[in-house]
Amino acid sequence: MWLPLVLLLAVLLLAVLCKVYLGLFSGSSPNPFSEDVKRPPAPLVTDKEARKKVLKQAFSANQVPEKLDVVVIGSGFGGLAAAAILAKAGKRVLVLEQHTKAGGCCHTFGKNGLEFDTGIHYIGRMEEGSIGRFILDQITEGQLDWAPLSSPFDIMVLEGPNGRKEYPMYSGEKAYIQGLKEKFPQEEAIIDKYIKLVKVVSSGAPHAILLKFLPLPVVQLLDRCGLLTRFSPFLQASTQSLAEVLQQLGASSELQAVLSYIFPTYGVTPNHSAFSMHALLVNHYMKGGFYPRGGSSEIAFHTIPVIQRAGGAVLTKATVQSVLLDSAGKACGVSVKKGHELVNIYCPIVVSNAGLFNTYEHLLPGNARCLPGVKQQLGTVRPGLGMTSVFICLRGTKEDLHLPSTNYYVYYDTDMDQAMERYVSMPREEAAEHIPLLFFAFPSAKDPTWEDRFPGRSTMIMLIPTAYEWFEEWQAELKGKRGSDYETFKNSFVEASMSVVLKLFPQLEGKVESVTAGSPLTNQFYLAAPRGACYGADHDLGRLHPCVMASLRAQSPIPNLYLTGQDIFTCGLVGALQGALLCSSAILKRNLYSDLKNLDSRIRAQKKKN
């Protein structure tokens, strides 16, 4: 009885998918990935004026190119990558950035003669031959050079009543697994099951991409029938918490903590994070970490020329006040604040890389914010974790100070959820004394070009989770004029964290030249991150639910307004890149994933011939 019904449903679904595919990818736009554009990396450009011409072109009305095809709001990598892909397809694109320098979380800034990154601490899967490296090479013409971190690439430090324990995460699958088993010899079978599950789940990530192409009613029907989670391990794991899966595997509390150590890279504790998100990140880094040679500003520096060569531009100091809508409610341009005046820029397509909250709550006119589709999307997500970043100038080279390229994650409790919940619910005056976790690293030790550019000196960065509410009373104050109470409170986190680092690296005593800290308010100012949430919308179980994932797509409820970046897929450079591919596919009406696969196959076939 059921077999004919199932077969009928399968035939109908196949027919729908065929119709959807033809409708989505029926465009006649040129293929942006028609040929291999990779070339050997050019020498690192260190001339400040040359870099300024690319990264710091200030907005003025006469700098706006004529006959624009697309305007992109925000120059984070999700915006730049989408603009570059569209430029490769012949589109003239203008990217507008509110900050003084392009790049978003990829931009760098100078402090006391040294350079600091703002968001790129390490990237996985950037070895030659990986799909992520291949896509970036095609966007930047192979000009990004990636330096591998040493092994172990991460060390989890657990400070407990019985002393300190360290758990190294070694590069390469075999070494990674062996390192875990050496620390937990009684739980080898559990570790094997965990790794197998990570690989199975992460291999299904394309299913999340497929969801964003299917019509929402089809996704909802498949979800109600239980078919999404039945046939996709990734989507099944999107409904299970990390803590739930580790408990089902039978891991001890200490092993659960160690396997969960990387959660700060997506900002959600084990009870509230989806195992699918965790599996993606673990698999992403299992072969090791990489860092852009020359620093993270290289990413924007080598993406912007692709946009410019197609007649486009990337302009800074360009705060977009609103998305312009025509009488039919379609996006038709943007309004940019220039001094006390507004400059209207008209174009057929607007792309927002400003995130869901900025786009829907601040950039849309009031009547558009009330649209059911807009309200529905905002109702399914919330801002993520806030961070305080600490930037430290050190006297001495990495050899002098014995600085590794390894990242450190320091914890004080195996129950990470309880520790974080207790911490964020504390009165702010007590919080600095109970920091539950700390990330720190030495960016200067990761970059092979550092010593040539900044001889005799080094840098360190620390990241501390902090509640936005603790800083909220100063949100209306101007940057740099928030008063002594703000500085004292912010510095309480710095002092507490520095004491931890100096215990692990006592050789740094007396080598600190300067310390600068940025609170969630700093992220809000420089990155336009609502509530200082550097990862955008929270990556919790709610956001990773298959139906919510499907609804967070490039096509917005406003015709001709598209979304790109980390809110469309996941956080991180590669997540933002996926958002850009989804956005560009929707605009060009091309399956860019298929285009990339075809190009990769042709390149591999050519290499075999040679």
From Swiss-Prot:
Needed co-factor(s): NAD(+); NADP(+); FAD
What main location does UniProt list?
endoplasmic reticulum
The question of whether 4Fe-4S is a record keyword is answered with no
Q: Which Pfam families match?
A: NAD_binding_8 (PF13450)
| EC number of the protein | 1.3.99.23
State if NADP is listed as a keyword.
Answer: yes
Q: Which GO terms describe its molecular function?
A: all-trans-retinol 13,14-reductase activity
Q: Which reaction does it catalyse?
A: all-trans-13,14-dihydroretinol + A = all-trans-retinol + AH2
GO biological process terms on file: retinol metabolic process
InterPro entries listed in its UniProt record: FAD/NAD-bd_sf, Retinol_saturase
* Compartment list: Endoplasmic reticulum membrane
| Cellular component per GO, a single term | membrane
What does the similarity note say? Answer: Belongs to the carotenoid/retinoid oxidoreductase family. CrtISO subfamily.
| Protein role | Catalyzes the saturation of all-trans-retinol to all-trans-13,14-dihydroretinol. Does not exhibit any activity toward all-trans-retinoic acid, nor 9-cis, 11-cis or 13-cis-retinol isomers. May play a role in the metabolism of vitamin A. Independently of retinol conversion, may regulate liver metabolism upstream of MLXIPL/ChREBP. May play a role in adipocyte differentiation.
Indicate what this protein is called per its UniProt record. All-trans-retinol 13,14-reductase
